[in-house]
């Protein structure tokens, strides 16, 4: 069996990692991970044929030659290798988690820090037990600051990811009604996210906290954090902010000891105010000039269908269909209500991973949508469909049924909110809007 130290020597010579034979590049290291429906040990030979330098496997019968490296467990080896690499990096690592806004906040932080530093940030949402190790192993030795996104759907997952990423600084964007099934309810969500605070307490790291969020204050007090940097709209904050406008893009005023500044970002949604303020706070902490902070924010444009305002031939569409939970859905509906438009349309899909709370949460969101007095309501998915007799609007069990309806009933000159869980794939409706 090969040790982590020996495997690291291979990594130094071949620093590109692949876990999928469809993404093999010449001289990469192929890690043969297992999934529910596959065992990549069976693809080791194919990976080598396609140009991988070595295949890391945990089943000896697939060791076809000396380029197959046998380890006790491939996932464990990947995580241990990432942890070993992290130990060689003497840089600040900002660990980031939360129920909503993780990826947008990560990208905002990266945009601000990149005004002064060479920054690595998690690509996309590689934020789980596989994605975090892959992210850490993507940090080259010329990187000056790293921003690592950490996601979780059950307790002890953030704690485990912290042992790999070893953040020196941290931020929880918020805690909300997300992954309730895995966490065992909202209190479980709070406990799970607070594992980042517990780790930062252990290593005496810095924590950035939105003072206006009572849950974060409660969690930070329970953790007994020593080094806190506050941002918010009230109280004694290192960075204080004031929302000026949200129609359609966010404009805010922010201040600290040296002065007050204004910035208009390319983000829609009141809920992004605190995400922008977090990036400002972290930029200021790392000694980036106010003008450069604003420059980074102005030059950031959302991607991956998170709060993107898209102008189509017929409508203005808020593309927020990357994911959804009750907290983010409520925020999106409230945001739509606050925006100016002659005609407003809501198209929302089911929210997943809510467990026993699913019926209650979908019923509440349907009521909020109805009470918003929007011009058109379209609900998609079996969870929403269960309440079709209790609310006005169009209800469809499947996206396919909704597609057929939209193909026959044109929506035009409207401000449209398009939002649902990733599995609903509501982006497929966008061409009809």
Residue ranges of model-derived segments:
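N-terminal leader/targeting and accessory segments in enzymes
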Residues: 1-80, 84, 268, 337-341, ...
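Residue-level signal for inorganic ion chemistry
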Residues: 28, 47, 81, 96, ...
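Active-site beta-alpha connecting loops in nucleotide-dependent enzymes
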Residues: 33-38, 303, 322-392, 421
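Acidic, Mg2+-coordinating active-site environments of NTP-dependent enzymes
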Residues: 58-65, 171-316, 341-342, 367-376, ...
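Phosphate-binding loop of NTP-binding sites
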Residues: 77-211, 215-224, 283, 404, ...
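ATP-dependent carboxylate/acyl-activation modules
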Residues: 96, 304-306, 423, 427-429
């Amino acid at each position: 069996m090969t040790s982590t130290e020996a495997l690291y020597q291979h990594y130094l010579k071949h620093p590109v990692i692949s876990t999928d034979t469809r993404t093999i590049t010449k001289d990469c290291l192929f890690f043969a991970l297992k999934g529910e429906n596959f065992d990549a040990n069976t693809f080791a030979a194919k990976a080598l044929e396609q140009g991988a330098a070595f295949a890391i496997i945990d089943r000896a019968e697939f060791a076809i030659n000396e380029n197959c490296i046998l380890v006790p467990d491939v996932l464990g080896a990947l995580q241990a290798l990432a942890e070993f690499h992290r130990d060689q990096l003497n840089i600040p690592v900002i660990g980031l988690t939360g129920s909503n806004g993780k990826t947008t906040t990560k990208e905002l932080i990266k945009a601000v820090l990149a005004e002064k530093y060479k920054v690595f940030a998690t690509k996309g949402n590689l934020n789980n037990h596989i994605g975090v190790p892959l992210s850490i192993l993507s940090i080259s030795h010329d990187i000056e600051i790293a921003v690592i996104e950490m996601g979780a759907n059950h307790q002890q997952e953030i704690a485990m990811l912290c042992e790999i990423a070893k953040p020196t600084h941290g931020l929880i964007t918020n805690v909300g009604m997300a992954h309730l099934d895995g966490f065992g309810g909202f209190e479980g969500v709070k406990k799970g996210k607070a594992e980042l605070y517990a780790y930062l307490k252990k290593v005496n790291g810095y924590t950035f906290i939105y003072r206006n969020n009572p849950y974060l204050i409660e969690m930070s007090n329970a953790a007994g954090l020593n080094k806190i940097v506050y941002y918010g709209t009230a109280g004694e904050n290192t960075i204080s902010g004031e929302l000026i406008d949200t129609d359609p893009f966010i404009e805010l005023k922010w201040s600290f000891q040296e002065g007050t500044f204004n910035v208009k970002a390319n983000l829609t949604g009141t809920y992004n105010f605190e995400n922008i303020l977090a990036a400002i706070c972290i930029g200021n902490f790392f000694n980036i000039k106010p003008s450069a902070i604003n420059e980074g924010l102005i030059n950031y444009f959302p991607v991956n269908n998170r709060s993107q305002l898209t102008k189509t031939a017929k409508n203005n569409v808020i593309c927020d269909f990357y994911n959804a939970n009750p907290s983010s859905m409520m925020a999106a509906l409230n945001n739509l209500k606050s925006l100016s438009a002659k005609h407003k349309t809501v198209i929302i899909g089911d929210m997943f991973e809510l467990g026993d709370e699913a019926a209650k949460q979908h019923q509440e969101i349907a009521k909020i949508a109805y009470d918003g007095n929007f011009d058109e309501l379209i609900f998609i998915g079996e969870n929403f469909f269960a309440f079709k007799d209790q609310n006005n609007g169009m209800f469809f069990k499947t996206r396919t049924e909704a597609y057929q309806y939209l193909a026959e009933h044109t929506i035009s000159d409207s401000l449209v909110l398009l939002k649902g869980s990733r599995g609903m794939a509501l982006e497929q409706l966008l061409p009809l809007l």
